[in-house]
Amino acid sequence: RGSXLTILPLRNMRDIVY
């Protein structure tokens, strides 16, 4: 539950910071 959902936003935030 929320596996993806949690990984999707996490990866998006890191891509914007990097």
UniProtKB/Swiss-Prot annotation:
GO terms for molecular function: aspartic-type endopeptidase activity. Its EC number is 3.4.23.-. It is found in: Secreted. Coiled coil: none annotated. Glycosylated. The keyword Transmembrane does not apply. One of its GO terms (biological process) is proteolysis. It is an enzyme of class 3 (hydrolase). GO terms for cellular component: extracellular region. Keywords: Aspartyl protease, Glycoprotein, Hydrolase, Protease, Secreted. Belongs to the peptidase A1 family. This is Pregnancy-associated glycoprotein 55.
